[in-house]
Amino acid sequence: MEVVYEDNHIIIVNKQSGEIVQGDKTGDRPLSDIVKDYLKDKYAKPGAVFLGVVHRLDRPVSGLVVFARTSKALSRLNKMFAEGEVHKTYWAIVKNTPKESEGTLTHWLVRNEKQNKSYAYTSEKPNAKKAILKYKVIGHSDNYCLLEVQLMTGRHHQIRCQLAAMGCPIKGDLKYGAPRSNPDGSISLMSRRVEFVHPVSKETIIAEAPLPHDPLWQSFKP
């Protein structure tokens, strides 16, 4: 586990693809438990350690996850995430290059619980939720394109679904149209950067995740 930022109220860690943020029906050990153990050992805390989960990343996605270390930070961060005051920047390696080098995508997403998949429509549908993101082309390799993505809304599989609807599926994302999987089971999407006002100290916090060790990711290193 890699800690990117830590203080008395929050801890930001770099999640690896394949890890789950919070416990689920698979029974796999979640990142939240790993962070709790880290805090317990580091500070020699007796008894249970408080750790609040304020947001999640899909299992095959890597990058920054923010946790709260106090109940005060948890309640304030929950409000900040809900009100769009936490600015998250994602990087995605995609097949195909968008027609426009930057733009805004607006779709209505319908979630299929049984398939654990979202479907994008260009107009309103029953039970659909409006999804908006901004993207920008920031790099190219021989066969792929690197996009920087900022979410204006937070929907189920939003980036994966909307980029696929644009004709640019994320590398390795079989569920949304990639031709083949990545060898390690990841998809080439990461939570690269997070910026927000600290819920207690009110300082501006900016954290950035290192790129995955995969050679393709490393080829995009600034």
Model feature map: region roles:
Residues M1-P222:
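RNA pseudouridine synthases
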